[in-house]
Swiss-Prot record:
Keywords: Carbohydrate metabolism, Lyase
Species, as recorded: Crocosphaera subtropica (strain ATCC 51142 / BH68) (Cyanothece sp. (strain ATCC 51142))
InterPro entries: Etherase_MurQ (IPR005488), Glucokinase_regulatory_CS (IPR005486), MURQ/GCKR (IPR040190), SIS_dom (IPR001347), SIS_dom_sf (IPR046348)
EC nos: 4.2.1.126
Name by which UniProt lists this protein: N-acetylmuramic acid 6-phosphate etherase
HAMAP family in alphabetical order: MurQ
The organism's place on the tree of life at top rank: Bacteria
SIS domain: residues covered: 59-222
Oligomeric form and interacting partners: Homodimer.
Single Gene Ontology BP annotation: peptidoglycan turnover
Known pathway: Amino-sugar metabolism; N-acetylmuramate degradation
Active site: 87, 118
Gene name, Swiss-Prot/TrEMBL: murQ
One Pfam short name: GKRP_SIS_N
Amino acid sequence: MENIQERGHLLTEQINPNSQNLDQLSTVELVDLFNTEDAQTLKAIAQARIELAQAIDVTSKALGKGGRLFYVGAGTSGRLGVLDAAECPPTFCTDPDMVQGIIAGGAAALVRSSENLEDRPQDGAEAIAGRKVTEKDVVVGISAGGTTPYVHGALNAAKQRGATTIAMACVPAEQVPIVVDIDIRLLTGPEVLAGSTRLKAGTVTKMALNILSTGVMVKLGKVYGNRMIDVSVTNTKLYDRALRILEELTELSRQEAAELLDRSGKRVKLALLMHWAELDAEVGQLLLDNHHGNLRAALQAGQNS
């Protein structure tokens, strides 16, 4: 019993005075309370904007040089990291190895709670070793309360291997100091249901991960304007989206867009370059490869040649 760490002082564990009578509210009052409290997530993101921007810049540079991005967490934090990583291949046509989610307990913990596994820092360290993390990589440790041993074990192992380390926590640094390269604090206050960090802490973490991964992909040239030009055309919904992107950006008819997409091998970015620079698929792809997949740079080079 004497080895159990007292966490009552942590912001995420404190009692929210606004929800003291949660069990006595009408249903509409309960919904209104959640809505009011969730507004804190927007403020938290705004307060962490500089650190988020730093994380985007550092990570995009690392990935642009062949590095990888790892999210590490347990419970809700781990699931959110895995979710964000899983969305990168279909949205940005990235290799599944480029952005990876690591959760305490592995795949089984995605659907069944394995909270006891978060107390093993050695497991976090072993997960980093198993991925052969190097100085080229970026490791983001996600922990709402900032104290998760599994996450700390992973971050410490990543530092020893020379990787860039980023922390994402929902408690002030003075409550839980974490020695990392970039320290992102997302302070949303005590939860409506005391200690349930799947609520505001989970929501703000998802928002931050959305911004981080999307920002990185923008910097890597996987977006043109606000269109996902590296979308992986793997089902009818995404095929339709690819066609609409081509129609909107080229003013081609839907049939013409479909023919262009087919000639490009269903690669939207290449299709755009082929159309705008009047190139065939082979030359267009070579031009993209020579400009690290950046459409604007490849287009400028193609038009100047």
